[in-house]
Structure formats: C-alpha cells, structure tokens
C-alpha cells in the first residue's frame, strides 16, 4: 500500500472549528487497527491538546520546536519526535510549510515501559 503526501495535502485545510479557528491542518491518511497515520501541516498556531494514544512525529519538511511537558526540543527534516499518551505538547516557532507524519498507536493511555 502507498500513501501519498501530495494527495493528502490537497485536502487541507479542512474547515475551521472552535478549537482550530485558522482551519484544521491534519488529516487521517490511513488507519489499521489501533494505528492511524495523520498528515500534520500546521499554519499559524498549534492548538493541540493531549492525545489518548502514544504518538510518533516524523518531520518531512520544515523546522521548529516541540514543547513537550515544558521542555523544548528543536527539530528539522528527518527527525522523529515521540510524545507519550496524555502528555501536554505543541509545536512552536515552526516554519511556513512544516509537514510531518504523525503515527498514533496502541491502547488508550499508551504503552507501558518494558
């Protein structure tokens, strides 16, 4: 199976909502079982709230800073960023044109350390 970034980008932005007043800049590109693949291409501000599953962001284009639980993690293309289920996080200081895949998986509340 192939999932196209170009095809999914063409569907963005989705209409604005109360939570995302500048429009919704993520779309589910694929789902299988508990795993979902989201294309995230924010514009303006990032209004995310904690998620119920663990997530892995893979940066395709652009740079910025992930703020996770108050700590800053600068990122650039090719980087992968992990956020545990329930953690406060958002993206800041990101370049116009930021694009990343976000992979959500596992049970509600996230995986436990082995």
Model regions: which residues?
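Ligand-binding loop in jelly-roll beta-barrel domains
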Residues: 85-111
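Short histidine-centered beta-strand/loop micro-motifs
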Residues: 27-29, 46-51, 68, 92-93, ...
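Short hydrophobic/aromatic-rich beta-strand segments that constitute the beta-sheet cores
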Residues: 37-39, 66-68, 100
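A short, N-terminal "cap"/entry segment at the start of jelly-roll beta-barrel domains
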Residues: 1-39, 44-48
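A generic "binding-loop/recognition-motif" signal
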Residues: 33, 43, 71, 87, ...
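Short, conserved beta-strand element in jelly-roll/cupin
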Residues: 51-66
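Short acidic-glycine-tyrosine-enriched beta hairpin
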Residues: 70-85
């Amino acid at each position: 199976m192939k999932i196209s970034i170009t095809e999914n980008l063409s569907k963005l932005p989705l209409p604005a909502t109360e939570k995302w007043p500048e429009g919704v800049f993520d779309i589910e590109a694929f789902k299988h079982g508990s795993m979902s693949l989201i294309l995230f291409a924010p514009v303006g501000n990032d209004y995310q709230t904690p998620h119920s599953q663990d997530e892995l962001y893979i940066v395709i284009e652009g740079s910025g800073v992930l703020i996770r639980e108050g700590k800053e993690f600068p990122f650039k293309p090719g980087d992968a960023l992990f956020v545990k289920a329930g953690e406060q996080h958002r993206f800041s200081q990101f370049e116009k044109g930021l694009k990343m895949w976000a992979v959500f998986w596992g049970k509600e509340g996230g995986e436990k350390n082995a």
